[in-house]
Amino acid sequence: MSREFKRSDRVAQELQKEIAVILQREVKDPRIGMVTVSDVEVSRDLAYAKIFVTFLFNNDDEAIKQGMKALEKAAPYIRSLVGKAMRLRIVPELRFEYDRSLVEGMRMSNLVTNVVRSDKERHIDEENGED
């Protein structure tokens, strides 16, 4: 009988919750600001975890670089807090990566909205010209 979810998936889901809470409540570095954990991928042996993050209200590349440096510097501290919060034999090594998918999704949505708006305006102008 196979399981519905692999253990690494369950650990990733729990890690996402714990790290989000830790970043919100425990990490006080001002360079990090409003950070969201969008996804977590855990290796099969649970030794490594890739944490995908986005920074809210911050599209400045320099601020994002500074935030990522701060997260990398705080990774051992975050890992120790995760170890206390979760009962794991091996607490995964945390590797933070910036998740561009949210920013790209918003950019694409804005492009579509602008195209639809200009198309409607063009049709309205054409209808007014026919009258």
Swiss-Prot record:
Key words of the record: Cytoplasm, Ribosome biogenesis
Domain of life per record: Bacteria
Major localization listed first in the record, in broad terms: cytoplasm
Subcellular location: Cytoplasm
Keyword set includes Cytoplasm: yes
GO CC entries: cytosol
GO BP annotations, alphabetical order: maturation of SSU-rRNA
GO MF, any single term: ribosomal small subunit binding
Gene3D superfamilies: 3.30.300.20
Cited Pfam families: RBFA
Family: Belongs to the RbfA family.
PANTHER family tied to this protein: RIBOSOME-BINDING FACTOR A, CHLOROPLASTIC-RELATED
Assembly notes: Monomer. Binds 30S ribosomal subunits, but not 50S ribosomal subunits or 70S ribosomes.
NCBIfam families per record: rbfA (TIGR00082)
Physiological role: One of several proteins that assist in the late maturation steps of the functional core of the 30S ribosomal subunit. Associates with free 30S ribosomal subunits (but not with 30S subunits that are part of 70S ribosomes or polysomes). Required for efficient processing of 16S rRNA. May interact with the 5'-terminal helix region of 16S rRNA.
UniProt name for this protein: Ribosome-binding factor A
Organism: Mannheimia succiniciproducens (strain KCTC 0769BP / MBEL55E)
